[in-house]
């Protein structure tokens, strides 16, 4: 269970993430720690909250995540797990999501097929030229709905897609979060 292994790495680095309490994986059952339902997103939507303090905590958490060096852990089956590297294959798969989600609903069937073929060719060509500098722990879903407020601390959920990747990935996820108008908050730190 990747989720548990990644959370163990986070916990070992003093980052609050749900712990696995019990599991019967063969019966499709796991019991994990409940971090509650107070997402940072809910807090930031409320009027009168000190939003700057939350953004400061989020940035400190991001720095802490990016400082993780030990990327190996034993999973609940006592097997070694190492966080994989973000590679060109993963990049191509993520680029293809554009076709799966956006193009699928916005082009005719004939245009979709032609677009998909051309898009894949262009993406493959671009990735051949790309030199990935992947050396940082990347959560890959680092946005305010996956950040939990727990007793004056920020916890992290939904970590199963973590990889070793580019340091800009999680920051871009946070800044470009469609649920939150971060532009209206950027003046707070300037």
Per-region residue spans from a language model:
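A generic short alpha-helical patch detector that favors 3-5-residue windows
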Residues: 32, 90, 115, 163-166
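Active-site acidic catalytic loop and adjacent metal/ATP-binding pocket
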Residues: 65-66, 123-171, 178-181
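Well-ordered alpha-helical scaffold segments within catalytic/enzyme domains
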Residues: 102-104, 174-177
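Glycine-rich, phosphate-binding/catalytic loops in enzymes
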Residues: 48-49, 172-174
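Conserved small/polar residues in nucleotide/adenosyl-binding loops
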Residues: 186-190
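Charged, solvent-exposed alpha-helical segments that act as regulatory interaction surfaces
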Residues: 71-75, 104, 108, 184
């Amino acid at each position: 269970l990747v989720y548990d292994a990644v959370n163990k790495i986070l916990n070992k680095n003093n980052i609050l993430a749900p712990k696995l309490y019990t599991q019967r994986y063969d019966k499709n059952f796991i019991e994990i720690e409940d971090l509650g339902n107070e997402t940072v997103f809910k807090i930031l939507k409320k009027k009168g909250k000190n939003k700057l303090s939350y953004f400061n905590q989020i940035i400190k958490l991001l720095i802490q995540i990016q400082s993780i060096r030990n990327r190996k852990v034993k999973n609940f089956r006592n097997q070694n797990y190492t966080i994989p590297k973000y590679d060109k294959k993963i990049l191509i798969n993520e680029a293809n999501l554009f076709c799966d989600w956006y193009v699928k609903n916005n082009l005719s069937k004939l245009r979709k097929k032609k677009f998909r073929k051309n898009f894949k060719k262009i993406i493959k060509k671009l990735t051949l030229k790309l030199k990935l500098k992947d050396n940082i722990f990347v959560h890959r879903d680092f946005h305010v709905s996956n950040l939990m407020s727990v007793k004056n601390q920020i916890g992290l959920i939904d970590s199963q897609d973590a990889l070793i990747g580019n340091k800009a990935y999680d920051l871009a996820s946070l800044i470009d979060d469609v649920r939150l108008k971060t532009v209206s908050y950027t003046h707070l730190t300037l």
